């Protein structure tokens, strides 16, 4: 679960860009976020059961049923022992780095094409178009995209466990079933987002001078929600089975394509926010086609089919995490509505901030995916001795790397804002936002560590409840009840560290109790 500080940060926190996708979720992912422009499982066993850290009897039954449903597609070649799996056998800290860097690059390129949208739109079409891309419309899209990111991350846990247990037939059927469900969810989001675009933007008090471009952006990008959901699921599955390089190659290609289309539609044809939206939607379609081709050549090496019993497990694993991601985004939508009341300059600064702080969220998201994948595969392989070591190694690396990221964003706050908009008032507002909030980002790191570890262990129900109250409820109350008492931008921003602190404490208590129930094996 990563939480960008803007609708786009996680790719879109996670966004048309919230592709902060992943074995556990997309960089994402990286567009609804912790908030500045909008801006982060159920288990092999039930999360309330002491057996949640292992493939339980219930899961064993599901595995057996899945195998039976895939029996006709299994062959001796499928069930033979694979080559050594470095995630379950290699030196942990080295393998984490080998797995992490392709993920980070994937998140970087995913966020790059979202950031290029903002750069080109802000510099060529002006602050009104920039506000449309990164303001209310981006926040609304972030709700759907982050749900897809979270859902795919939860479903990918099942893929990681099947892969670690070498259940190839069950893996193929699970992936096909997950892709079908993702397509249905994407269609649902597209219909809702397109059909109710105008009333949604009106409820969010979108300023009149940016309502029209926001409406165009929301409706056009909503057409890409179906391929976005499919891509997120496909990329999450590939990462869950240890392949983080091909999703990276896909993102590099689509990023380059998106930049070219941005220049064509926005700079060349002068289409403004609608042009940026068209470029995003087309590239989402391209990424979905490419990831399906890769899956066809890897996971679907033989015939596979959808399976009702797997659909139930996928929904049980994916829905809690999907809703957890939506909670962050929904809470940020509430704050976005508050920010709209400060005028277009503040909205533009908030949108730019959301693109800049994506650097933090994509690093967080990549580490979170790494934790989930290592924990999930080692549990599936029966290597529970490696679980806590994976978590410890990732924790040390996260604090070291993210400490440098936070320092860099704090120091270069104003120059980074100037990249997006030349208006001095917008730059000043955005720079103050970053300098105020950046020191608090350390509070979020423990949340990502514990949520990702629990997700890999197969526990998502209680973490989702913690997230609901610690983030969604508390942050919404902050925006609606506390901010009006002292109506300033800093008071809006203070809602992020307050909710991070409360959620971190709640996770720490639950995580320690959860591990204690598992005994010394973990």
Predicted features by range, described:
Residues 98-117, 220, 231, 254, ...:
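Transmembrane helical elements of multi-pass membrane transporters/channels
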Residues 89, 93-112, 116, 140-147, ...:
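Residue-level signal for short hydrophobic patches within transmembrane helices
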Residues 118, 127-130, 168, 244, ...:
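Membrane-helix interface/capping residues of multi-pass secondary transporters
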Residues 2-36, 41, 46-48, 54, ...:
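Short alpha-helical transmembrane segments in multi-pass integral membrane proteins
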Residues 152, 220-239, 250-258, 276-289, ...:
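Short runs within selected transmembrane alpha-helices of multi-pass transporters and secretion channels
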